[in-house]
Amino acid sequence: MSSTRIPVIALLAAAGRGTRLGGPIPKAFVTLRERTLLERSLQAMLTSESVDEIIILVSPDMETYARDLLRKRGLLNDPEGVRVRLVHGGGERADSVWAGLQAISLDDATPDAIVLIHDSARALTPPGMIARVVRKVHEGATAVIPVLPVSDTIKRVSPDGGVVVDTPNRAELRAVQTPQGFLLSELVAANEKFFADPNPGFIPTDDASLMEWYGADVVCVQGDPMAFKVTTPIDMMLAQRITDEAEPTIFEVPGD
């Protein structure tokens, strides 16, 4: 649990269907070496010793399954002193996050509370990286994202994907990961504005892009290659190889 008086609340997105992974069940519940991606992501949050509450966003049809699974694993009922609960997510990621934010009792949270938004599919995220994001918000940032340099050349293409428009300077590009950290009051305000606008002009692909749209400065911290998103069968093969060879060391770190 966070030792500071400012509460840190994590929203763990687990409502997606995961169609690109190709399995019969939602991606968060796919098993990686006898533990689901959701369990692994939840354990990383607990091991980081940075959060006071974790809200897991699940689709309504998976709530009972998720509750039974987490109860069996001892991950409900305040494991390690951290409150863990389930909330129904929405049809799109932005809808799920908004549902999670609305589930936070603002009466219990101080105006400067911190919220983390994390993808359960980033199941091997090191706890130290989670702590790094939280620390940066504690230091005064409104919005924080973990990033990595890109190794591939990136092309911007025409809407039909057939013609290259230009080549951005790779030195200025970063791959963005989660968890992303925010001041709770600012992220709530950005979501209120977005969902109240019948034509916001864009679809947020992550919460940082919503904060950019809202006008907030988004600060970068160092990401970690282990925080990759398990999206395709190849990603799952990589995750299996890593856990086969390095399972005992994956969750060793709280700090950095």
Curated annotation (Swiss-Prot):
EC number(s) on file: 2.7.7.60
Alphabetic keyword roster: Isoprene biosynthesis, Nucleotidyltransferase, Transferase
One Gene Ontology term from the biological process aspect of the record: isopentenyl diphosphate biosynthetic process, methylerythritol 4-phosphate pathway
Molecular function terms, GO-annotated: 2-C-methyl-D-erythritol 4-phosphate cytidylyltransferase activity
UniProt xrefs under PROSITE patterns: ISPD
Pathway(s) it belongs to: Isoprenoid biosynthesis; isopentenyl diphosphate biosynthesis via DXP pathway; isopentenyl diphosphate from 1-deoxy-D-xylulose 5-phosphate: step 2/6
Residue ranges of coiled coil: none
SUPFAM superfamilies: Nucleotide-diphospho-sugar transferases (SSF53448)
Catalytic activity: 2-C-methyl-D-erythritol 4-phosphate + CTP + H(+) = 4-CDP-2-C-methyl-D-erythritol + diphosphate
Domain of life: Bacteria
Site positions per UniProt: Positions MEP for the nucleophilic attack: R170, K229
Family annotation (Pfam families): IspD (PF01128)
Site location (Transition state stabilizer): R20, K27
Family of this protein: Belongs to the IspD/TarI cytidylyltransferase family. IspD subfamily.
Free-text function comment from the UniProt entry: Catalyzes the formation of 4-diphosphocytidyl-2-C-methyl-D-erythritol from CTP and 2-C-methyl-D-erythritol 4-phosphate (MEP).
NCBIfam families: ispD
HAMAP family per record: IspD
Name under which the protein is recorded: 2-C-methyl-D-erythritol 4-phosphate cytidylyltransferase
Organism listed in the record: Corynebacterium glutamicum (strain ATCC 13032 / DSM 20300 / JCM 1318 / BCRC 11384 / CCUG 27702 / LMG 3730 / NBRC 12168 / NCIMB 10025 / NRRL B-2784 / 534)
Encoding gene, per UniProt annotation: ispD
